[in-house]
Regions:
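GNAT-family acyltransferases
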Residues: 1-132, 145, 149, 190-195, ...
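Flexible ATP-lid and adjacent glycine-rich G1/G2 motifs of the Bergerat
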Residues: 142
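Conserved GNAT acetyl-CoA-binding A-motif
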Residues: 148-158
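Conserved beta-strand-loop-alpha-helix junction that forms the acyl-donor binding cleft
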Residues: 157-166
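Conserved catalytic-core motifs of GNAT/GCN5-like acyltransferases
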Residues: 176-190
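Glycine-rich acyl-CoA binding loop
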Residues: 135-136
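Conserved active-site tyrosine of GNAT-family acetyltransferases
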Residues: 169-170, 197
Length: 248
């Protein structure tokens, strides 16, 4: 990060003479090869989401989530009715392009266009969606929307510090760990220490390339098994990117 001094000799941050803010994401959908994200619609998505979430017999997909569990379709419908169409936190249903069915939700939140800060959160993926190309591409589409299309400077990922799957996902997706905010929230009758992860605009290019290579059809065999890991591809692209910067 560039640091400079003002007329008083004090250290100040880098100048942003051309910064005019980012755009609000709104509720516009996103589509890729495997996944499609559509603005959450109670009428269209509740039944499919309830069926998909019901694959989780134990209810563990709700442990680290501020919402749920939803034991009836009507309770999920009540939540989707309250969550859909909210500009402060636009929720999307994650659709499998092959089946056309919804099996997860994700949202943009903590949206601050004036500062160029936005977070991907509110994620709940049904067991059948987890660890699939559809799930990975859904997150990539949201990252692409925020960083490339809307011009955000900082993309955040936060989770309960004890939520090891979410922390592993953040690192796999190229986010960098920034620390833990202790006693940051309370939910479901317990304390939450929050782990913070972020990706900056200047870090996005090699991460984007890693995703694009991983999502390419040739990275998978006929059974859908990956040839190269996403984390390895991002690491490779980062090594090339920063080596080029050093030479320049």
């Amino acid at each position: 990060m560039t640091v400079r001094r003002n007329e008083h000799g004090q250290l100040i941050g880098m100048a942003l003479p051309n910064w005019a803010g980012a755009e609000h994401p709104g509720h516009k959908g996103m589509a890729g090869r495997y996944a499609r994200l559509i603005s959450l619609d109670p009428l269209t998505h509740t039944k499919e989401l309830f069926e998909a979430f019901s694959q989780d017999r134990s209810g563990k997909i709700w442990t680290y989530n501020f919402i749920g569990p939803f034991n009836t379709a009507s309770s999920l419908r009540a939540w989707t009715e309250g969550a859909s169409g909210v500009d402060a936190q636009p929720y999307f249903a994650v659709i499998d392009q092959e089946t056309g069915k919804a099996s997860g939700i994700a949202s943009f939140m903590r949206i601050q266009p004036e500062h160029g800060v936005i977070e991907i959160g509110g994620i709940t993926f049904a067991p059948g969606l987890q660890r699939t190309r559809v799930a990975t591409e859904a997150i990539y589409l949201m990252m692409q929307r925020a960083m490339t299309e809307l011009g955000y400077r900082r993309l955040e990922w936060k989770c309960d510090a004890l939520n090891t799957p979410s922390r592993a996902a953040a690192e796999r997706f190229g986010f960098r760990f920034e620390g833990v905010f202790q006693q940051a929230a309370t939910y479901k009758g317990r304390n939450r220490d929050t782990a913070w992860y972020a990706l900056l605009d200047r870090e996005w290019e090699p991460v984007q390339r890693g995703f694009q290579t991983w999502l390419a059809p040739e990275n998978f065999d006929e059974g859908g098994r990956q040839h190269q890991k996403l984390s390895d591809l991002i690491a490779l692209e980062r090594s090339k990117f920063y080596k080029t910067e050093d030479v320049a």
